[in-house]
Amino acid sequence: MASQIRHNYHEDCEPINKQINLEFYASYVYMSMGHYFDRDDISLPGASKFFKDSSDEEREHGQKLMKYQNKRGARIVLQAIAAPSLQEWGNLHDALQAALDLENEVNQSLLDLDATASKINDPHLTNMLEGEFLEEQVESIEKIGNLITRLKRAGTSGLGEFLFDKELKQRFLPSLTSHPN
């Protein structure tokens, strides 16, 4: 059955379904990282919370794109979500570097989609991508890059990593730090 509301939504914009998949994949990767750092033998609660929050954010992005597809009268075509390439994330520096690489991949995919929307003259899609995704993506890349720099200064393992995680915990888990056991 054809959509009654689809208007000026070119079929070349259907790759938005691939972006939905990429956002859910990113959520899946961050969820894996969050639970990895929550393990009893790793125990970095600040990192765990940071990555779990990142997972929630990426899932929300996927859902926002799904709502947009429906709003424009397009069809949502969900694809299988690939498993993360790693199950063991190493130290926090390694995980943050993987997160930065992932954010850059998501950003490039959004830029490609934005270029397609501009090429086929779809101002609605261009406006949505530029207003709701691209700026936030640049901020995420900057945030993770800054975290990597600060972690390198503190030391990427041992006491430096522990102290850095303590700072993350204070930023992302204020209720745990305000009531010491």
Curated annotation (Swiss-Prot):
What is one term from the GO cellular component aspect held by the record? cytoplasm
UniProt PTM: The N-terminus is blocked.
| Superkingdom of origin | Eukaryota
* GO term, biological process aspect, one: iron ion transport
PROSITE patterns this protein is in? FERRITIN_LIKE
Write one Gene Ontology MF term. Answer: ferric iron binding
InterPro entries assigned to the protein according to its UniProt record, in alphabetical order:
Ferritin, Ferritin-like, Ferritin-like_diiron, Ferritin-like_SF, Ferritin_DPS_dom
Q: Which residues bind Fe cation 2?
A: 58, 103, 137
Where does the chain cross the membrane? none
Mind listing the UniProt keywords for this protein, alphabetically? Answer: Cytoplasm, Iron, Iron storage, Metal-binding, Oxidoreductase
Annotated EC: 1.16.3.1
This enzyme catalyses: 4 Fe(2+) + O2 + 4 H(+) = 4 Fe(3+) + 2 H2O
Localization of this protein: Cytoplasm
Gene3D superfamilies on file = 1.20.1260.10
Please list the residues that bind Fe cation 1: 23, 58, 61
| UniProt domain Ferritin-like diiron: residue ranges | 6-155
Positions the record marks as coiled coil are none
Family statement drawn from the similarity comment of this UniProt entry? Belongs to the ferritin family.
Q: What does this protein do?
A: Stores iron in a soluble, non-toxic, readily available form. Important for iron homeostasis. Has ferroxidase activity. Iron is taken up in the ferrous form and deposited as ferric hydroxides after oxidation.
Q: Please tell me what else the database record remarks about this protein.
A: There are 2 types of crayfish ferritin subunit: a 19 kDa chain and a 20 kDa chain.
User: Tell me, how does this one assemble?
Assistant: Oligomer of 12 or 24 subunits. The functional molecule is roughly spherical and contains a central cavity into which the polymeric mineral iron core is deposited.
In Swiss-Prot or TrEMBL terms, this protein is called Ferritin
Species: Pacifastacus leniusculus (Signal crayfish)
